[in-house]
Amino acid sequence: MARYVFITGGVVSSLGKGIAAAALGALLQARGYRVRLRKLDPYLNVDPGTMSPTQHGEVFVTDDGAETDLDLGHYERFTGRSATRTDNITTGRIYKNIIDKERRGDYLGATVQVIPHVTNEIKDFVTEGNQDYDFVICEIGGTVGDIEAMPFMEAIRQLGNDLPRGTAVYVHLTLMPYIPAAGELKTKPTQHSVKELQALGIHPDILLVRADREIPEAERRKLSLFCNVRPSAVIQALDVANIYDVPMAYHKEGLDDEVLAAFGIEPAPKPRLDQWEEVCNRIRTPEGEVTIAIVGKYTGLKDAYKSLIEALHHGGIANRVKVKLEWIESEVFEKEDPAPYLEKVHGILVPGGFGERGSEGKIHAARFARERKVPYFGICFGMQMAVIEAARNLADVPDASSTEFGPAKEPVVGLMTEWVKGNELQKRTAAGDLGGTMRLGAYKAALKKGTKISDIYGSTDISERHRHRYEVNIDYKDRLESCGLVFSGMSPDGVLPETIEYPDHPWFIGVQYHPELKSRPLDPHPLFASFIEAATEQSRLV
C-alpha cells in the first residue's frame, strides 16, 4: 500500500517546494523505495501549454505528450523516473472534467459543488494508479492562504481521514527571515503560516524551514513548541550553492529519517548516496570552465529555459567542467554585429521559441557559428533558424523564411498539417485551437549511420520529446544537402527532418526535438555531454 507525503508552502511563494519534493523522492529512492511525485496546480488554465513563458516559465513535456509544470522536470531529474500526464493536474483541468461529467448527466441531477465534487475529483487524482509505489509525494502549488488553493487544502485534509491510519504525512515548507536590524532570525512568519494551515484542519508533521544561516537550537525549540511538532521534526533547509546539493543537505539534516519515522518505519533501510556524492564532488571541483552563449527571446525569465540550463550543467558534470552561461537577447543581433558578443564564447546555443520576434537575430547567431567554426547547438526553433540561414547564404534562396512569420515566398519552414503518432494520423489546421495541438511527446527518429549525431548516440534509432507546430520543409532537402548541410536524422517514415549537421564543422548540430527534457544529473544527455566536450576543446583555441 502506498504512503502519501503532502508538501505545502507558507509565508512566501518560490521557496522551492518542487526541489524539496524531488530531493525527498531521491532520498527515498536511495533507500530502495519506489516513489511517485505529483503536482497539484491551483491556476485555472487547463495546462500551461498556452501560458507565456515569461510568466509561468518552462512548459515541461512528458513522453506521453502532456504539457506540464516545470516542477515535473525537477522530479524527473532527481529521481530518473519519467513523469506522465497523470502526474500533474490544474484547477482548470479539474473544473473541465467536472463540467463534462455534469453535461453527460454523470451526477444524476445533483447540485454540483466544491464539496464534495471538486474535492472528490482532486482526491481521485491523488490516489489513483499508485498500487506499484511505496511512496507518493504530492506537491500543492501556491501558498497557504491563497484562495485558489483552498479546494486542494480541503481535499488533502479529507485524505488524512480517508486513508488508512499512518499512511499520510504533511510537510510544511516555510521561510525564517533574517532581520539585519534585530540581528536575528524570526519565527513569527512560520508560526502564523502554521496557524493558518491548522485552521484549515491540517496539522503538519514536519516543518522544513528555509533560512540563509544556521537556525539556533533555541529557535527550533520555539518553533516546535508553538507549531506543535516534535523538536526533531523542525528541519532547517539552508541555502546551498546548487540544487544538486539539496538531497545530501536534507539527508544531513534528517528529512528522510524524519519522514520515515512519521510513518513508523524504524529501522529504515540505509540510503545509498554514492552517486549523489560524486555529482556534488564534480560540481565543487571542476577541472576547467567553458562559456556558452544562449541566444534566446525569453531571457528575462531564466525559468523559461529551466531544463536547458540544467542539461548544460549536466554536460559540465559529464566533462568535469564548470559551465558559465552568457544570456543574449536575440533581438540585439538584429541591430548590432554579433561578433563582439560571441567572439570569446566557447559554444553557442539557440533554444526553442515561438513567433517572429528575435528570429533574425538567431539566424545571425547561426551564421556566426557556422563561419567562425564555433560549436553550435540549435534546438527546435534553433534548428529551423539554422536551416533558413543555410538556405539564404549557401543555397541561394534569399527569400527563405518560415510560414510562422506570415506568407513566405520560399517556405523553408512550414506548418505541419499531418503527422503520424503511433499508428494514427494526426491533423491540424492553421485556424485550430492552440492548446494541445502541437506535435507533443516522444517520437522515434532514424539517424543516418556514420553521422556525428549517430556516433554521439551510439545508435541510429532514438526516441526524443517534441513540442512544435512547424517543421523544416522536406522539399528543400536536396538543395540544402548539395550545399553541405546534412539531414542526419528523419522521422521513421522519412517525411519529417529531425536533425541536421555540417560534417566539415567541429560541432554544428540542430535537432527538432528537445533533448534537454531527458537529461539527468546522474545520466547526462549524450548531446549535451558532447556539446560541452566540443566547447571544452574550443576553449583551448580562444
Swiss-Prot record:
<keyword id="KW-0436">Ligase</keyword>
<keyword id="KW-0315">Glutamine amidotransferase</keyword>
<feature type="binding site">
    <location>
        <begin position="381"/>
        <end position="384"/>
    </location>
    <ligand>
        <name>L-glutamine</name>
    </ligand>
</feature>
<feature type="binding site">
    <location>
        <begin position="14"/>
        <end position="19"/>
    </location>
    <ligand>
        <name>ATP</name>
    </ligand>
</feature>
<feature type="binding site">
    <location>
        <position position="404"/>
    </location>
    <ligand>
        <name>L-glutamine</name>
    </ligand>
</feature>
<comment type="similarity">
    <text>Belongs to the CTP synthase family.</text>
</comment>
<comment type="function">
    <text>Catalyzes the ATP-dependent amination of UTP to CTP with either L-glutamine or ammonia as the source of nitrogen. Regulates intracellular CTP levels through interactions with the four ribonucleotide triphosphates.</text>
</comment>
<dbReference type="Pfam" id="PF06418">
    <property type="entry name" value="CTP_synth_N"/>
</dbReference>
<dbReference type="InterPro" id="IPR029062">
    <property type="entry name" value="Class_I_gatase-like"/>
</dbReference>
<feature type="active site" description="Nucleophile; for glutamine hydrolysis">
    <location>
        <position position="380"/>
    </location>
</feature>
<keyword id="KW-0665">Pyrimidine biosynthesis</keyword>
<feature type="binding site">
    <location>
        <position position="469"/>
    </location>
    <ligand>
        <name>L-glutamine</name>
    </ligand>
</feature>
<feature type="binding site">
    <location>
        <position position="222"/>
    </location>
    <ligand>
        <name>UTP</name>
    </ligand>
</feature>
<feature type="binding site">
    <location>
        <begin position="146"/>
        <end position="148"/>
    </location>
    <ligand>
        <name>CTP</name>
    </ligand>
</feature>
<dbReference type="GO" id="GO:0003883">
    <property type="term" value="F:CTP synthase activity"/>
</dbReference>
<dbReference type="GO" id="GO:0046872">
    <property type="term" value="F:metal ion binding"/>
</dbReference>
<feature type="active site">
    <location>
        <position position="516"/>
    </location>
</feature>
<feature type="region of interest" description="Amidoligase domain">
    <location>
        <begin position="1"/>
        <end position="265"/>
    </location>
</feature>
<feature type="domain" description="Glutamine amidotransferase type-1">
    <location>
        <begin position="291"/>
        <end position="541"/>
    </location>
</feature>
<feature type="binding site">
    <location>
        <position position="13"/>
    </location>
    <ligand>
        <name>UTP</name>
    </ligand>
</feature>
<feature type="binding site">
    <location>
        <position position="71"/>
    </location>
    <ligand>
        <name>ATP</name>
    </ligand>
</feature>
<keyword id="KW-0460">Magnesium</keyword>
<dbReference type="GO" id="GO:0004359">
    <property type="term" value="F:glutaminase activity"/>
</dbReference>
<dbReference type="InterPro" id="IPR017456">
    <property type="entry name" value="CTP_synthase_N"/>
</dbReference>
<dbReference type="InterPro" id="IPR017926">
    <property type="entry name" value="GATASE"/>
</dbReference>
<feature type="binding site">
    <location>
        <position position="71"/>
    </location>
    <ligand>
        <name>Mg(2+)</name>
    </ligand>
</feature>
<feature type="active site">
    <location>
        <position position="514"/>
    </location>
</feature>
<comment type="pathway">
    <text>Pyrimidine metabolism; CTP biosynthesis via de novo pathway; CTP from UDP: step 2/2.</text>
</comment>
<dbReference type="Pfam" id="PF00117">
    <property type="entry name" value="GATase"/>
</dbReference>
<feature type="binding site">
    <location>
        <begin position="186"/>
        <end position="191"/>
    </location>
    <ligand>
        <name>CTP</name>
    </ligand>
</feature>
<dbReference type="GO" id="GO:0019856">
    <property type="term" value="P:pyrimidine nucleobase biosynthetic process"/>
</dbReference>
<dbReference type="GO" id="GO:0005524">
    <property type="term" value="F:ATP binding"/>
</dbReference>
<feature type="binding site">
    <location>
        <position position="353"/>
    </location>
    <ligand>
        <name>L-glutamine</name>
    </ligand>
</feature>
<dbReference type="GO" id="GO:0042802">
    <property type="term" value="F:identical protein binding"/>
</dbReference>
<feature type="binding site">
    <location>
        <position position="222"/>
    </location>
    <ligand>
        <name>CTP</name>
    </ligand>
</feature>
<keyword id="KW-0479">Metal-binding</keyword>
<dbReference type="InterPro" id="IPR027417">
    <property type="entry name" value="P-loop_NTPase"/>
</dbReference>
<keyword id="KW-0067">ATP-binding</keyword>
<feature type="binding site">
    <location>
        <begin position="186"/>
        <end position="191"/>
    </location>
    <ligand>
        <name>UTP</name>
    </ligand>
</feature>
<feature type="binding site">
    <location>
        <position position="139"/>
    </location>
    <ligand>
        <name>Mg(2+)</name>
    </ligand>
</feature>
<dbReference type="InterPro" id="IPR004468">
    <property type="entry name" value="CTP_synthase"/>
</dbReference>
<comment type="subunit">
    <text>Homotetramer.</text>
</comment>
